[in-house]
């Protein structure tokens, strides 16, 4: 999708709005971490003889001269082979190379950004991998972005009529339907399918979800609350539906062939994140925490 030209200008209470958004992202992080740890406790099927995993939080600060930092929360468990739930709030100036790509940054390179990012890779091949992020960005303009997408790793589960796919799409459609003045589900669904695509393989990364960016209030600053409420509901719907999908599948036995297929599919995940993902590029270009940025990569991968 082509980047729009966003109206410039910030409301008088922009600092309050920044603090409100940051507090939400951090609250959602804590809620999801508690939920995922509960899943670790609930497992009774394969690998249940292992100890349940727990998140290890790690705070970080940007390098000297750069502003802000964040918290990495990583877990390697018996349900989640690797999951990261991260928040960050950073500020500074975009590099000359990067400022042309960001609305409102060409004349004034200063920026502020806060958000949450999550990627989960499960032990059981029947449990789909998942990604979710939402963020607020401020330059001389302001906007929200984010989305969520599901990646089943077994080909027989990578269909639009699979029960997991149907439930995931329904949850995100509900988030959009609750906010018709600011959210466009058909557009965001199509945007996700266009974005999470590997051109060199001519195949999608997963079964889709939603993707949105540059969601802004323009000169109608009262719309900020409506935009923020939608962003919150994306997080709430994700936090409700994905644990349900895990519960449906995490006790299902799997074969060595299933595990092999999972590892090969993860290779596609690596290819997308390193070649095309805007979030990865944004983090590396703005002096983000490299360990946190690359934590999205799965722990074990295979290229046949």
Swiss-Prot record:
Pfam families, alphabetized: Coprogen_oxidas
Gene Ontology BP annotations = protoporphyrinogen IX biosynthetic process
Residues covered by region (Disordered): 44-73
According to its UniProt record, in which pathway does this protein act? Porphyrin-containing compound metabolism; protoporphyrin-IX biosynthesis; protoporphyrinogen-IX from coproporphyrinogen-III (O2 route): step 1/1
- Annotated binding of substrate, by residue: 117, 133-135, 287-289
SUPFAM superfamilies from the UniProt entry: Coproporphyrinogen III oxidase
Q: Where is the active site?
A: 131 (proton donor)
Query: Where does this polypeptide localize?
Result: Cytoplasm
Recorded superkingdom: Bacteria
Keyword terms of this UniProt record? Cytoplasm, Heme biosynthesis, Metal-binding, Oxidoreductase, Porphyrin biosynthesis
Query: Per the UniProt record, which EC number(s) apply here?
Result: 1.3.3.3
List the residue(s) that the UniProt entry marks as the site Important for dimerization. 200
Q: To which protein family does this belong?
A: Belongs to the aerobic coproporphyrinogen-III oxidase family.
What's this protein's function?
A: Involved in the heme biosynthesis. Catalyzes the aerobic oxidative decarboxylation of propionate groups of rings A and B of coproporphyrinogen-III to yield the vinyl groups in protoporphyrinogen-IX.
Subunit structure as annotated in this protein's UniProt entry: Homodimer.
List the protein's name.
Oxygen-dependent coproporphyrinogen-III oxidase
The root-end lineage is: Bacteria, Pseudomonadati, Pseudomonadota, Alphaproteobacteria, Hyphomicrobiales
């Amino acid at each position: 999708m082509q980047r729009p030209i966003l109206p410039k200008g910030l409301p008088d209470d922009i600092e309050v709005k920044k603090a409100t958004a940051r507090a939400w992202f951090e609250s959602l992080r804590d809620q999801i971490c508690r939920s995922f740890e509960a899943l670790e406790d609930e497992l009774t099927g394969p690998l249940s003889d292992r100890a349940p995993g727990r998140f290890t939080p790690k705070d970080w600060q940007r390098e000297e001269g750069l502003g802000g930092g964040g918290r990495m929360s990583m877990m390697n468990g018996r349900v989640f082979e690797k999951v990261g739930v991260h928040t960050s709030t950073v500020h500074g100036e975009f590099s000359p190379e990067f400022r042309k790509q960001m609305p409102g940054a060409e004349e004034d390179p200063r920026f502020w950004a806060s958000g949450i990012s999550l990627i989960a890779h499960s032990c059981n091949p029947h449990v789909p991998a998942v990604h979710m992020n939402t963020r607020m960005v401020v330059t001389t303009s302001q906007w929200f972005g984010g989305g969520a997408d599901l990646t089943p790793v077994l080909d027989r589960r990578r269909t639009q009529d699979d029960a997991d796919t149907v439930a995931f799409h329904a949850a995100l459609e509900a988030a959009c339907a609750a906010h018709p003045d600011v959210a466009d589900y058909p557009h965001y669904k199509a945007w996700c399918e266009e974005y999470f695509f590997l051109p060199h393989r001519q195949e999608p990364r997963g079964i889709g979800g939603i993707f949105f960016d540059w969601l802004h209030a323009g000169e109608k600053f009262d719309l900020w609350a409506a935009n923020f409420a939608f962003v919150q509901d994306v997080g709430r719907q994700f936090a409700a539906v994905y644990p349900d999908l895990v519960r449906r599948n995490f006790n299902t036995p799997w074969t060595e062939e299933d595990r092999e297929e999972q590892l090969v599919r993860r290779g596609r995940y690596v290819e997308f994140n390193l070649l095309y993902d805007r979030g990865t590029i944004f983090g590396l270009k703005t002096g983000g925490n490299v360990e946190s940025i690359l934590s999205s990569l799965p722990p074990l991968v295979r290229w046949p």
